[in-house]
């Protein structure tokens, strides 16, 4: 039955064009720009992310990350993208569709990060809006889920402005920055209907 099939890409997924942004899979040649942006944005990002390993910004750790993304792609478990500003090809952030669940679920989880110099300029909103047709069309997902810490007003605003609906509250849902944190749970359905 076609409904239960997985997606098999023999190559990386295509680049996705959005309003002023391009989403494309990361590659090793992105390391220097990626590491510099993450380092510059460390204090901005760490309150909202899992604890960074000590070697997180090294070339070898980035290589492992690229390999993991490749394995996730081959097994239809995840799709990673860098967000590139189209006006000058600057790397501004990243976005993933991860934890892809097939069968009767046909769902995945949206994750994202934005570099500090590019925050609050609409790039992430454009990126999320661009990846939604890929998730529902190419990947044939029925549901995209996302979670954010209740005090992360930027993420709450982003999700609500891109059609996600708040569905619940999960206590100590994820270990973020070394602490088990409560999260707001959001989802967007393929048909866009709000129950």
Spans of model-derived segments:
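A generic secondary-structure signal
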Residues: 68-72, 134
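Short loop/turn motifs at secondary-structure junctions and domain boundaries
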Residues: 71-77, 164
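Acyl-donor (CoA/ACP) binding surface of acyl/acetyltransferases
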Residues: 1-33, 37-47, 80-195
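Conserved GNAT-fold acetyl-CoA-binding loop/helix
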Residues: 46-67
């Amino acid at each position: 039955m076609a409904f239960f099939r997985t997606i098999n890409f023999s190559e990386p997924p295509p680049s996705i064009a959005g309003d002023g942004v391009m989403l494309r899979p990361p590659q090793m040649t992105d390391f220097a720009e990626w590491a510099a942006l993450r380092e510059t944005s460390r204090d901005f990002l760490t309150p909202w992310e899992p604890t960074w390993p000590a070697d997180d910004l090294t070339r070898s750790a980035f290589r492992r990350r690229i390999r993991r993304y490749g394995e996730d792609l081959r097994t239809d478990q995840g799709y990673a993208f860098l967000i590139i500003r189209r006006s000058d090809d600057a790397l501004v952030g990243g976005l993933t569709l991860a934890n892809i669940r097939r069968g009767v679920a046909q769902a995945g989880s949206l994750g994202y990060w934005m570099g500090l110099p590019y925050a609050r300029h609409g790039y992430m909103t454009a990126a999320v809006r661009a990846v939604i047709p890929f998730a529902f069309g190419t990947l044939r997902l029925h549901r995209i889920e996302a979670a954010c810490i209740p005090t992360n007003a930027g993420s709450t605003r982003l999700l609500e402005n891109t059609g996600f609906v708040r569905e619940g509250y999960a206590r100590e849902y994820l270990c973020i920055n070394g602490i088990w944190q409560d999260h707001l749970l959001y989802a967007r359905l393929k048909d866009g209907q709000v129950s």
